[in-house]
């Protein structure tokens, strides 16, 4: 399933804390890492990994060995036939992901991973601000993000293919965000 997921050009990644139980009943903090395909990918899949830490190295390791994708140029820097995943990675602002978006020092490798911010995480921060402080600015931001979400809902409701949905998003997103 991981090999199929890594054929995607768009992936979503996120990590959430969990409690890991040891053999003697001891408890440790761990994280469940989720990697999901984008909504327009040919496969709808999620791969979960449970790790004892939150280090961004876990995401780097997951993306390290991707099978070749047809018609997609990738940087080869592993064993023959093994290539690092490249594409658009949708993540929150957790610092652990940042190393994925820059070349490795001293190696000169272009990782070809493009950071895509997650609107759900942005929206949650404005929602928390609105609840805590009844912020008028947060209320405006929530309304504009909601209008942005409508672009995607409308595209799915109309059954637009990826190219059509992308064109709509490019045409309608900025005006909706700017109000």
Indicate residue ranges for each PLM-predicted region.
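Catalytic center-proximal scaffold of phosphoryl-transfer enzymes
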Residues: 1-179
């Amino acid at each position: 399933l991981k090999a199929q997921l890594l054929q995607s050009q768009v992936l979503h990644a996120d990590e959430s804390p969990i409690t890991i139980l040891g053999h003697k009943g001891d408890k440790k903090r761990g994280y469940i890492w989720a990697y999901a395909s984008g909504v327009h990918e040919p496969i709808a899949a999620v791969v979960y990994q449970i790790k004892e830490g939150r280090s961004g190295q876990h995401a780097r390791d997951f993306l390290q060995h991707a099978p070749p994708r047809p018609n997609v140029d990738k940087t080869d820097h592993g064993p023959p036939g093994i290539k690092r995943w490249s594409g658009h990675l949708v993540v929150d602002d957790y610092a652990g992901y940042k190393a994925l978006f820059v070349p490795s020092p001293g190696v000169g490798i272009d990782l070809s991973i493009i950071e895509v911010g997650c609107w759900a995480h942005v929206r949650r921060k404005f929602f928390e601000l609105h609840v805590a402080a009844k912020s008028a600015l947060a209320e405006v931001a929530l309304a504009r993000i909601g209008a942005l979400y409508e672009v995607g809902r409308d595209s799915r409701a109309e059954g637009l293919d990826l190219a059509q949905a992308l064109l709509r998003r490019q045409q309608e997103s900025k005006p909706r965000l700017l109000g």
